């Protein structure tokens, strides 16, 4: 007895999106299959289009075996709507009380602080006018009309595409529409049932001292090395100890230039003084990144329950949000966004929800380069020491270069790097193409 699973696409019906499993008698025809589907879902057999592996099954008198439907097959059924159905105005359908009576909804919002909190996240502009009945009524009606128009447009589009059920391109467009609906539904479900995922998570910082200078360190177990910015190294007075033989390029989300390495300096954490090595790197948004190398060396544990970085004998509390440096937050405010429910914006990297217009959306194409790389991009291991002369003091990058084009093109073709990266490698290697290649080999 063949057993098939059927995915039903029937917009505007209770069966839309359902998965139906049927056990069919041996020798059943395609017409019989449609009859079984109609009996289970009340969807007219004449409106059903059956698809196997994306291809329509149209020979109704053939048996399932003859048209290639075997036991365990997955079928798709797309129901063609009555052509007159899209002409039925949406207003003629009964609407829930909340949609037909804006004042009833307003009173519910006024009485229920929990509803106010939800509305503050979903539609802060509407919440701001809840005490003005006239403005509320106008805004509510505007939102209701927009939703009805969007639904009517969607139904009309599906109806037009369904006029030719055997057009592969039309069915692909219907599939895209349905897929996008599922994405929006999934976003709405997360927004309603798991709103915590849209709250910005603040990074973990601790207070430290390096060479007697206070520094707020970002704790990042995803970074392989402990990293310090050149400005911070200057403030702490350890730039003079930097070994430029360890210069190179770090790769992750974008690239960052490694100026060198300080092999030994003292860092004070929670009253304990610990020897530490620092990789000095440009292009980071933090002064000091306390990486996995030091976390493992001192057997540190990130204890989120205690909100502390725990060593064997001390616990160092993570900084409160108000004490965290603002440069990372400013970078997050300029991150790219995607559209969320009710006009909100959701950060593409952080997942944080903001009111519409709450940030300046940055095109993803502008995010390439070291400054766009998040702290975790520092997890790229520092290159091994160069074999010859130390690197010169960090010259400013430039597209125009005095290096031979042949050398630049050679590095670009060998390692698939951008022109600017090839020039930077040649600058580090004082123009020696072989030493520049060792920068990329790490």
Swiss-Prot record:
It comes from the Eukaryota. Residues 4-84 form the Ubiquitin-like domain. Residues 82-96, 364-402 have a biased composition (Low complexity). Keywords: Aspartyl protease, Cytoplasm, Hydrolase, Protease, Protein transport, Transport. Residues 402-442 form the UBA domain. InterPro entries: DDI1_N (IPR033882), Peptidase_aspartic_DDI1-type (IPR019103), Peptidase_aspartic_dom_sf (IPR021109), UBA (IPR015940), UBA-like_sf (IPR009060), Ubiquitin-like_dom (IPR000626), Ubiquitin-like_domsf (IPR029071). Its main location: cytoplasm. The keyword Signal does not apply. SUPFAM superfamilies: Acid proteases, UBA-like, Ubiquitin-like. PROSITE patterns: UBA (PS50030), UBIQUITIN_2 (PS50053). Gene3D superfamilies: Acid Proteases, DNA helicase RuvA subunit, C-terminal domain, Phosphatidylinositol 3-kinase Catalytic Subunit, Chain A, domain 1. GO terms for cellular component: cytoplasm. It is found in: Cytoplasm. Its EC number is 3.4.23.-. Probable aspartic protease. May be involved in the regulation of exocytosis. Acts as a linker between the 19S proteasome and polyubiquitinated proteins via UBA domain interactions with ubiquitin for their subsequent degradation. Required for S-phase checkpoint control. Binds ubiquitin and polyubiquitinated proteins. Belongs to the DDI1 family. This is DNA damage-inducible protein 1. The gene is DDI1.
